[in-house]
Amino acid sequence: MFARHSNANSAVINALQADSSHVVIDFSGSEASVFLSAILGHDLTKLTASGFGFKGTLDGDLNSDFSYAVYYFSETAFRFVLPVNASLQLQALINEQQLRYDIDFVVRTDLATFTLKGDNAFDTLVEAFKLTPGLRLADAQLCYGAQSGDVFVTAVDQNNEQQFIVIAKTSTLDKWQQYMQQQGFSVTNTQAA
């Protein structure tokens, strides 16, 4: 199953942003949900199935370099996708709370990302990764991620623009970046979500 936002606009140009500014952190522990609720202040009731996620922030601004997306895998396992600045602050916060909560994290230095946007982005991703379309997210703070083989594909609303972040090991991601370029997505130097 895959999702997109019902109220977000698509970029005019089909674009691919190769992105070294995102960090992926896998977060787990028997008290991972408690930490997200108590320390980060998140309401986890909307996370009803694996892949659902939400946008959060460490500084009160959902569009800053301290914002993040966190995806639910289970009560004890989550994935953060966030800018480098936010990842450093989040790692410090988790380290500070590890004595209080049964939590741990792994910075996935083996994973890289690119951002895809444009009118053809959703359909191209559904076709390329054999995803089943069907979910429409009305809340801009919700996001969704789906695993397809070695690739994790996410849907986020960034400043009222539908964007998709593709996450995989570098060699796999390079292959998919070439594929997306063959599908008409121009590589841009503009900062993405």
Predicted segments, located by residue:
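Basic, glycine/lysine-rich polyanion-binding surfaces/domains
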Residues: 1-193
